[in-house]
Amino acid sequence: MAWWNRTMVSTQTQKSALSLTTIAFTACFAVWTIFAIIGVQIKEDMGLSDTQFSLLIGTPILTGSLVRLFLGIWADQYGGRPIFMAVMLSSAFFTWCLIYADTYMLMLLTALGVGLSGGSFVVGIAYLSKWYDKEHQGTALGIYGMGNIGAAVTKFIAPFVMVAYGWHAVAQIWAIALVVLAVVFWVFTKD
């Protein structure tokens, strides 16, 4: 994107980048916090101790926090768009794998992968910063930051899905939604 002048980009293109990136971040944040809801049932199903449960819930948060450094570097090197899509697809894969994790160790490993979705924050910032000049970056990034509402999405919708279909369905639906949004993001955004 460095080869073109940012001032020549249409406002519509900027708004499209902002809205799709914010929606993608919302979905990633929803996935990142999935254990806050399904974790209680997993604890019961697997007979986890309080310590094991705490570690399970904290694992994706730790991964998402630590991976941001690398994802930020890669977003600078390769562009935010391909890295964001890779984060969404890999997070979707690990979220889907949750339904097959039948041991605590497998659940922890998939939780590590689910945590990649937490790194989407820095990728979106790197991507959107290139679309807006300095005078408009604060507003754009503030709107993007509203994607944290994904945690509320999980806390509001996941219990209904869990009651109706079980915690496995939550993982499946969140994974499918992430794949669909990754494709939409890729098709309708530009580098």
Kindly give the residue locations of the regions a language model identified.
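Cytoplasmic helix-loop-helix junction between adjacent transmembrane helices
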Residues: T110-G147
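Helix-loop-helix hairpin linking two adjacent transmembrane segments in secondary transporters
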Residues: I143-D191
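Extracytoplasmic
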Residues: S16-D50, L71
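Interfacial helix-cap and linker-helix signal at transmembrane-aqueous boundaries
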Residues: I42-K43, W74-A75, F160-Y165
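Transmembrane alpha-helical segments of major facilitator superfamily
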Residues: L55-G64, G147
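Residue-level signature of mid-helix packing/kink "hotspots" within the transmembrane helices
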Residues: T33, I61-L69, G119, A151-V153
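MFS-fold secondary transporters
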Residues: F94-L98, T110, V114, F185
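Conserved MFS/SLC helix-loop-helix module at the cytosolic interface between two early adjacent transmembrane helices
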Residues: L66-M105
